[in-house]
């Protein structure tokens, strides 16, 4: 009887062990599948991850989209060219020594070429890239220090070279032409800044760091002065929130960056995370952080989107192609809101000088 009892116990223990092993393997498989479906950016803390420095980069070398420019030789860019002259944007890109070749060079090869001036801000100087050395340490706890010092550097060296000053990450993709249209309605001498507006912790809201944000010249002046007079201090390592608190203290307005239809232009994730319904779980922090009611699916994003975040190098080039090269034959753009009245007159004059009789509607059709 005793031997039978021991046999039952042994059988139970063996069965439990086998069950545990099989269960562990099954859970491991499920977690791997979940990891593939929900990429690592889906942290439940909006400040838990910024730009990973240890991601695998599967892209060797840079790509030159200008190498095949023959199809664009007759492209009419008069309006974009006029905006480039009238709405001058200095872009500074937050990066690090280990990311210059992994990420920053792909920013440099794509959207950064459309900035009026671009600077890459790192903890160490690199004269070959080149990158500005801010003499900080690397790490998430240094993000706000890097931001403060970067804006101070820009203020001291390039204040008169631009009207607007944009901060972006080395995994952010920015459509500068759309940003210029957005900013063309505003005066850079007014204290205002734009980005993806979040609402917690700051009464007027603050701008998401990853989606990028842009300060008017007056906002930049006030920000730098605030650290000289101790109106603002390094109050937190959470860069975007800390900067937002400072902006509120110094009476810099958190601007509305939505387009004329109410759609968002700055996006804290890659396009598919906003476009695919159900991709971001309802328990995810994102749904509680948006200042304006968030939309998922095709209505999520403006046709004149300004930025996307968590863009790896391969996707950087994909977006470059989709934004500036892919066209459906035979279509005029369906959504192209008018320019401000003063700028519209200036652009119209270009066509008049070319003996083109232009009013606002033909102007929209001509710039495709």
Curated annotation (Swiss-Prot):
Origin: domain of life: Eukaryota
Designated name of the protein: Glycoprotein-N-acetylgalactosamine 3-beta-galactosyltransferase 1
Cofactor or coenzyme needed: Mn(2+)
Subcellular location: Membrane
Assigned protein family: Belongs to the glycosyltransferase 31 family. Beta3-Gal-T subfamily.
Function (record text): Glycosyltransferase that generates the core 1 O-glycan Gal-beta1-3GalNAc-alpha1-Ser/Thr (T antigen), which is a precursor for many extended O-glycans in glycoproteins. Plays a central role in many processes, such as angiogenesis, thrombopoiesis and kidney homeostasis development.
Organism of provenance: Bos taurus (Bovine)
UniProt enzyme class: transferase
Catalytic activity reported: an N-acetyl-alpha-D-galactosaminyl derivative + UDP-alpha-D-galactose = a beta-D-galactosyl-(1->3)-N-acetyl-alpha-D-galactosaminyl derivative + UDP + H(+); a 3-O-[N-acetyl-alpha-D-galactosaminyl]-L-threonyl-[protein] + UDP-alpha-D-galactose = a 3-O-[beta-D-galactosyl-(1->3)-N-acetyl-alpha-D-galactosaminyl]-L-threonyl-[protein] + UDP + H(+); a 3-O-[N-acetyl-alpha-D-galactosaminyl]-L-seryl-[protein] + UDP-alpha-D-galactose = a 3-O-[beta-D-galactosyl-(1->3)-N-acetyl-alpha-D-galactosaminyl]-L-seryl-[protein] + UDP + H(+)
Assembly notes: Homodimer; disulfide-linked. Interacts with the C1GALT1C1 chaperone; required for galactosyltransferase activity.
Membrane topology category: Single-pass type II membrane protein
Residue numbers of Phosphoserine PTMs: 235
Cystine pairs: 91-115, 232-246, 300-301
Protein keywords: Angiogenesis, Developmental protein, Differentiation, Disulfide bond, Glycosyltransferase, Manganese, Membrane, Metal-binding, Nucleotide-binding, Phosphoprotein, Signal-anchor, Transferase, Transmembrane, Transmembrane helix
Binding site residues for Mn(2+): 169, 171, 309
Lumenal topological domain residue ranges: 30-368
Entry EC number(s): 2.4.1.122
């Amino acid at each position: 009887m005793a031997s039978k009892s021991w046999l039952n116990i042994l059988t139970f223990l063996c069965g439990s062990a086998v069950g545990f092993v099989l269960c562990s393997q099954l859970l491991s498989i499920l977690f791997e599948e979940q990891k593939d479906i929900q990429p690592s950016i889906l942290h439940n803390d909006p400040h838990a991850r910024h730009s990973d420095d240890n991601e695998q980069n599967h892209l060797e070398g840079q790509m030159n989209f200008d190498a095949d420019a023959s199809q664009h030789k007759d492209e009419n860019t008069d309006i974009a060219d006029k905006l480039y002259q009238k709405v001058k944007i200095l872009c500074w890109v937050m990066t690090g020594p280990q990311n210059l070749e992994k990420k920053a060079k792909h920013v440099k090869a794509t959207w950064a070429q459309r900035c009026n001036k671009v600077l890459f801000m790192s903890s160490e100087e690199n004269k070959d890239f080149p990158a500005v050395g801010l003499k900080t340490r690397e790490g998430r706890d240094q993000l706000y220090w890097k931001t403060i010092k970067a804006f101070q550097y820009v203020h001291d060296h390039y204040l008169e070279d631009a009207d607007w000053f944009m901060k972006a990450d080395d995994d952010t993709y920015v459509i500068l032409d759309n940003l210029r249209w957005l900013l063309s309605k505003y005066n850079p001498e007014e204290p205002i800044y734009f980005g993806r507006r979040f609402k917690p912790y700051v009464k007027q809201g603050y701008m998401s760091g990853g989606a990028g944000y842009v300060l008017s010249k007056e906002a930049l002046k006030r920000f730098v002065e605030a650290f000289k007079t101790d109106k603002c201090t390094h109050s937190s390592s959470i860069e975007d929130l800390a900067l937002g608190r400072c902006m509120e203290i110094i009476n810099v307005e958190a601007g509305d960056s939505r387009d004329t239809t109410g759609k968002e232009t700055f996006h804290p994730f890659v396009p598919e995370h906003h476009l695919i319904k159900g991709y971001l779980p309802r328990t995810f922090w994102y749904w509680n952080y948006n200042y304006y009611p968030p939309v998922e699916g095709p209505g999520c994003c403006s046709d004149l989107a300004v930025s996307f975040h968590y863009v790896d190098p391969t996707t950087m080039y994909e977006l470059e192609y989709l934004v500036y090269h892919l066209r459906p034959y035979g279509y005029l753009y369906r959504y192209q809101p008018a320019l401000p009245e003063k700028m519209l007159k200036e652009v119209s004059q270009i066509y008049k000088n070319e003996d083109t009789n232009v009013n606002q509607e033909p102007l929209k059709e001509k710039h495709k």
